[in-house]
Amino acid sequence: MDHNVNAPLRDDVRLLGDLLGECLRQQAGDSIYETVEKIRQASVATRTEGGASLASLRDLLSPLDDATLLEVARAFSQFLNLSNIAEQHHRERLHRQHQRYPGDAGTDQGLQEVLQRLADNDIAKEQISGTLEQLSVELVLTAHPTEVTRRTLIRKYDQMADLLSELDRPDFNEDERELRRERLRRVILAAWCTDEIRREKPTPVDEAKWGFATIEQSLWQAVPDVLRQLEAQLADRGLPAPPSDWAPVKLASWMGGDRDGNPNVTAPVTREVLLLARWMAADLYLRDVENLLADLSMKSASEELLAATGPTHEPYRVLLREVRSRLRLTRRQMEAQVEGLPVPEGQAYLRREELMAPLQLLDRSLRAVGLSDIADGDLKNTLRRLNCFGITLLRLDIRQESTRHSDVLDAITRYLQLGRYSDWDEAARQAFLVDELQARRPLIDAAFRDSEHCTAEVAEVLATCEVIAEQGSEGLGAYVISMATTPSDVMAVMLLQKIAGVREPMRVVPLFETLDDLDGAEQTMSALLALPFYRERVAAGQEIMIGYSDSAKDAGFLGAAWAQYRAQEKLTALFADNGIPLTLFHGRGGSISRGGSPTRMALLSQPPGSVAGRIRVTEQGEVIRFKYGRPSVAVFNLEQYVAATLEATLLPPQAARPEWRQQMQALTDTSVAGYRGVVRDEPELVRYLRTVTPETELSRLALGSRPARRKSDQGISSLRAIPWVFAWTQIRLMLPAWLGTGAALEDAQNDAAQHAMVREMASEWPFFQGVVDMLEMVLAKSDLRVAAWYEERLAGDDPGLMRLGEVLRERLTATVSALSALTGREDLLDNNPVMRWSIRVRDPYTDPLHLLQAELMARLRQQDGDETLESALMVTIAGIAAGLRNTG
C-alpha cells in the first residue's frame, strides 16, 4: 500500500473517529464511551492474539443490558459509515489530482488509457470516432432492497464529504479550518441523534423519488461534466468532437415499473411515477432556463432568431421567457394529474423535440454571431441534459413475470370459448398469437371486464398496458418478461399491448435467468426469428436480458457465470447471422453472486462481439449511492462505462479455446453438482439459514417495497436472490459466491494436466480471469471465525446444525486453499494490498457488530417484539452492510 498517497485518508478517518467519540461522550456519557473503547481495543486484540482475546471480547458484551447494546451497536455502525465517507472522499481527491486510487488501476481505466491502447493496436481514428458516435450505454436504476441507509442520513453524509473537501483547500488558514471542523462535528452530532433505522417500508413511489433525487443532486451535473471531460480527452488525441446530440450515456429505471413479485406496484402507481418524472424534469429544466435568462442578455442575434422573436433588444430572453412559461405549465399539468385536480389548459411539453427546438435556435444564433464561447457554456449543458434525460427524466421499464401474461390470455380464451390457453402446447399458443397479432379486429369487447373471467389479477395486467397506451412512448423503455422460457412468452406481451391500444409499443425484452432458460435462450429466440412478422418487428434491433441473480441461486456462482457466457455467445452469433443488432441487458447486482464486478472487468469478460458498442445494465440499491451519489464520483464511473464499452467493442477479449471450453464445462459440472448437493439436497440447510443467519430478521428491516419471498412457503426456492445473498453476507460465510466452485477447482488440481490448463485459463482468458478475481475478492471478505460465533451462540445445542456448520466452514477453507493453489499467492488479495487493507481496517469495527448481532438474535428469539432489541439488531444489520460495502 502506498502510505504517502493514503496518508490523507488515514488523517480523515482519525478526524471523523475523534469527532464521533466527542459526540458519543456528550450524548451517551463517559460510561458508554469507555465501554465502546474497551470493546474496540479487545476487538483489535482478537485479530492479533486470537482465542483468549475473543473470550474477553465476549465477556465484555454478554453482560451488557439491552439499552447499552443498542448504543454500542450504533457507535460501531456509525464509525463504519464515517470510514466509508472518508474512503469515498479519498477516491474523489485522487481523481481530481488525476491519480488512481491504489488498487483501481488493474480494474477500471479511463478514456485516456483506452485511447492509448487503441492507438498501440493501430485502430484507425475514423473507426474510433465512428464507434464513439454510435456508443450506447444505458444505466437502469433499480430499487432492489439493498440500500440500508436512510435518505436523511445520506444527506448528512454528503454534507460531511463536502466539509472534508473544504478541509483539503490549501488556501484556508487555521481559523477557517477550525470553523469547518466545528461544522463537521455538528453534522456528525446531528447524524448520531438521528434514528438510523427506517421504521416504515418505502412505497414504490418513495423509491422512485429516491431515484429522482439521485438525478437531481448528482447526475444532472455529472452528465454534462463527463461529456465535457470526454470531449477534451478526444481533442487531446486529435480526434474530432462528437456531434452536438451525442449522448453515449442514458438513464432508465425500474422504480415504479418493476411489478415482478411486488403487489405494491400497480397500474396507478406506474402512472403516478411517470407523471412525477415529467414533473421533476420540468422543474429541473426550469432551473436551467432561469440561469440562461440571467446569462443570455446579449442583443446580437441571427436573422432566424429575430424572425421568431420580433424586434427586441433582448431576443434570447424573449424566447427563453416563452420556454419558461411552457415549462411552468408543464409542471402545473403534471402536478394536477398526480394530485387528481383539474388540469390547467394549454400546450405542455410532451416530446423532447418540442423543448429542443427553441434551445437549438438559441444555440445556432449565438454561433452565427460569433458567440460560440457563450453557446458552449450553460446552454450546451442544458442541451446535453435534454439529449440524455429527455423531458421524462428517465425511461421507465415495466417488468412482469411471464405466467401473469399467460393467465390473462387464458382468461380471454375461456371468455371467447376457445378453450384454455394454459392447456395448449407451445405450437398452438404460437399459432393463436401470430393470428391475433396480425388480425385487424379487436380480440375482446368491453364486456370482458365485467365477466367472471376478468379477475383482479387479470384486470391489473390489462390496466398496466392501458397506462402504457395513455402515457405514450416518450417516458417508457423496455417491457421485461421475467422467467421467460418460450417464444409465446414474448408474443403474449406484444398481443396484450395491442389489446390495450398501444400505438407505439414498448420493446419486449425476454429475461433468461435460470440455468435451463439460459441454455434454451438461443432456441427460443431462433424460433421467434423464424416467424416473418417477428423478424420484421425487430429488424432495427433486439434486446435480451441476462439474469445473474436467479441463475446463481439456481446453479451457484461458477455454473451461472458459464451459462451466462455461453448464452451470450450463442445469442450474439444468432443475431449476427440474421443481420439484426443485439443489445444485451445485464441484470447485475452489487455482490459477485448477483453479477457484481468492476466495470471494466465486467465488460471485458463478456464474449467477443457481444458488446458491439451497446450495453444496458442495472445499477441496484446501495451501488447507486456509491457510484453515482456525488457528482465527481458519478463523472468517474460514467467515464468508466464509456471507456470500457469502447474498449470491449474495438479490442474484444480473446475467444475461448476449445480446450478451455471443455475444461470450463468440466469445472461447471462439478461445481453445479456440489452447489445443488447442499442447497437442494441438504435437509438441514433451510433450518441453518433460518437459525444461524438473520434471514428471518431481515424481513423486519424496512429496506424496500418488495416482499422478500415470491410465495408464502418458507423454502429456499421461494426466497428472492437478494435476501438469500444478504443473509449469508451478514454472517461472513458468503456461501452463494463460492459453494461448489472450490470443489471444482480441487477436482481439477488432482490432475496435473487439468491443473495446468486451469492456470493457463486464469492467466490468458479474460472471462476466467474475472471469475477468479471476483472469487478472491469475496473470499477475502469471508471469515470462518465470525460464522462460527453465530453457530455457537444460536445453534450450540443443535448437533445437526453444528455438523452442517462445520461442513460448510471446511468447504470454505478448502475453497481458499484451492484458489491459492491456482493463483500461486499465499494470502488472499496479495495482488491488491489496498483492498486487503480496506477490509482489515474495518474488521475491529465489524467484529463487535457480528458478536452483538448473534447476541441480539438470541435475546430476540426469547423476547420477541422487544423494541430496543429490534432496533439494536437493525443497527447491526446496517452496520455490517456498511462495513462490507455490499449487501445483496
UniProtKB/Swiss-Prot annotation:
Reaction(s) this enzyme catalyzes, per UniProt: oxaloacetate + phosphate = phosphoenolpyruvate + hydrogencarbonate
Keyword Lyase set for record: yes
Cofactor entry: Mg(2+)
EC number(s) given by UniProt: 4.1.1.31
Protein keywords: Carbon dioxide fixation, Lyase, Magnesium
UniProt GO cellular component terms: cytosol
Active site: H144, K553
Annotated GO MF terms: magnesium ion binding; phosphoenolpyruvate carboxylase activity
Classification via PROSITE patterns: PEPCASE_1, PEPCASE_2
UniProt record, GO biological process: carbon fixation; oxaloacetate metabolic process; tricarboxylic acid cycle
InterPro entries: PEP_COase, PEP_COase_bac/pln-type, PEP_COase_Lys_AS, PEPCASE_His_AS, Pyrv/PenolPyrv_kinase-like_dom
EC main group: lyase
Matching SUPFAM superfamilies: Phosphoenolpyruvate/pyruvate domain (SSF51621)
Family named by the database record: Belongs to the PEPCase type 1 family.
Function: Forms oxaloacetate, a four-carbon dicarboxylic acid source for the tricarboxylic acid cycle.
Protein name (database record): Phosphoenolpyruvate carboxylase
Organism: Alcanivorax borkumensis (strain ATCC 700651 / DSM 11573 / NCIMB 13689 / SK2)
Lineage: Bacteria, Pseudomonadati, Pseudomonadota, Gammaproteobacteria, Oceanospirillales
Gene: ppc
